[in-house]
Amino acid sequence: MTNQQEQHIAIFTTASIPWLTGTAVNPLFRAAYLANDGERRVTLVIPWLTLKHQKLVYPNSITFSSPSEQEAYVRQWLEERVSFRLAFEIRFYPGKFAIDKRSILPVGDISDAIPDEEADIAVLEEPEHLTWFHHGQKWKTKFNYVIGIVHTNYLEYVKREKQGRVKAFFLKYLNSWVVGIYCHKVIRLSAATQEYPKSIVCNVHGVNPKFLEIGLRKLEQQKLQEQPFTKGAYYIGKMVWSKGYKELLKLLEKHQKELAELEVDLYGDGEDSEEIKEAARKLDLTVNVYPGRDHADSLFHNYKVFLNPSTTDVVCTTTAEALAMGKIVVCANHISNKFFKQFPNCRTYDDGQGFVRATLKALGEQPSQLTEQQRHELSWEAATQRFIKVSDLNRLSRADSNLSKRSVFASSSISVGKNLEDMSAYIHFLASGFEASRTAFGAIPGSLQPDEELCRDLGLSLNTPSPNTRKQD
């Protein structure tokens, strides 16, 4: 550890504000709440993109000329959503946006963002994503303890592509390989994710406090016998077919007669928006399609029912937000929604007729009033408590002496399993060190080392890999 009293937790993630995706928002809140009690030092490590790549990713033409400018933007965004002083650091690693994958991939050895002498505990948000093409020091060697948090059901997305089942077969083993090499502990947000050896399923995410505040205002209206919800049903999500729109429009099309009086509003932006609008227009039902908005926008406060048939999410953020706002949620009876079943306003269905019954029943009654404990379960305070418990952070902090790679893992270092793991890690190191093999497996060309522009923006030396990058210990 950096000192005997304080853990240093470095949280690495695959996206950053202003991109309002789950891996940008949730690790940001995690960093804030982990650092809030002052018992540990926390550093959030996020990708830096060159101007060209920023324009491909960030909404509303938002761009940054320097990492410090983006850091200021990120901090301001978070300060508007929490009520306490932010006590964590922000650092950047070089990244590039992969258009075909619609995601940011690391460039070079991103573990270099944390100096060796500061390396203690690493949290890899989307560990498979961060390590597919990792070429540098082994994460378990550099850090005393590495925790992976699995956010995304990559196999489900890949299965929807051409030759999807074949791709998913190989991706499953690639994910298991890299996560096993680089993580001591794996937390899966729900059982909808790929299974990993020695992993634990726990939802360690909470909701933006703004949604709980909205829910409290609605609760007060209910207590005063006022009408808190004056609108009907809606759905909000990135407008791509795989994000629940395909399932929702199929259900609406098949059951138009039973749902003849239903009016649904859809909100979102995305690559499939025109196709989705066209499909909605063909229905006899009234289905309105609008551009995406922040879910906390006052526009959404008065909707009573949130329809979410998506089964590709691991734990759907918008479902949690809708419940926090006091709404009724109608969602599929799917393992990704298991966490939400504890709330009385969560209504699940197994088939089309079940969807019709649940939707009509939800529209015809008032939502149950959430208890204080139920609201707490949705909060980031509760999510942080769950994370600390399942990741064993308190057990680590109570150790009689500092963690060390040698003392904690000495018994396994001489085992056959450890030797095989080291050999496996070395094979991955070799394979990820050649441009041809990297690109063959889907890496962005030229991502082995940061280019001149990334180096200039981040103050790195061009074509001078650090010792960590040159050597896989």
From Swiss-Prot:
Effect seen on changing residue 299 to A: No effect on catalytic activity
Catalytic reactions on record: a 1,2-diacyl-3-O-(beta-D-galactosyl)-sn-glycerol + UDP-alpha-D-galactose = a 1,2-diacyl-3-O-[alpha-D-galactosyl-(1->6)-beta-D-galactosyl]-sn-glycerol + UDP + H(+)
E.C. code: 2.4.1.241
Chain intervals for the UniProt region annotation (Interaction with the membrane lipid bilayer): 130-148, 227-245
Keyword Cytoplasm carried by entry: no
Biological process, per Gene Ontology: cellular response to phosphate starvation; glycolipid biosynthetic process
Organs and tissues of expression: Expressed in leaves, flowers and roots, but not in stems and siliques.
Subcellular location as annotated: Plastid, Chloroplast outer membrane
Activity regulation: Stimulated by anionic phospholipids.
Effect of mutating residue 139 to A: Abolishes catalytic activity
Main localisation: plastid
Pfam families from the UniProt entry: Glycos_transf_1
Documented effect of changing residue 241 to A: Reduces catalytic activity 100-fold
Source organism, top-level taxon: Eukaryota
CDD domains assigned to the protein according to its UniProt record, in alphabetical order: Glycosyltransferase_GTB-type (cd01635)
SUPFAM superfamilies in UniProt: UDP-Glycosyltransferase/glycogen phosphorylase (SSF53756)
UniProt keyword list: Chloroplast, Glycosyltransferase, Membrane, Plastid, Plastid outer membrane, Signal, Transferase
Recorded consequence of changing residue 177 to F: Reduces catalytic activity 5-fold
Effect of residue 25 to A: Reduces catalytic activity 3-fold
GO MF terms, alphabetically ordered: digalactosyldiacylglycerol synthase activity; UDP-galactosyltransferase activity; UDP-glycosyltransferase activity
Functional summary from the UniProt entry: Involved in the synthesis of diacylglycerol galactolipids that are specifically found in thylakoid membranes. Specific for alpha-glycosidic linkages. During phosphate shortage, involved in the biosynthesis of digalactosyldiacylglycerol (DGDG) which rescues the limitation of phospholipids.
Family statement drawn from the similarity comment of this UniProt entry: Belongs to the glycosyltransferase group 1 family. Glycosyltransferase 4 subfamily.
Name assigned to this protein: Digalactosyldiacylglycerol synthase 2, chloroplastic
Species this protein is from: Arabidopsis thaliana (Mouse-ear cress)
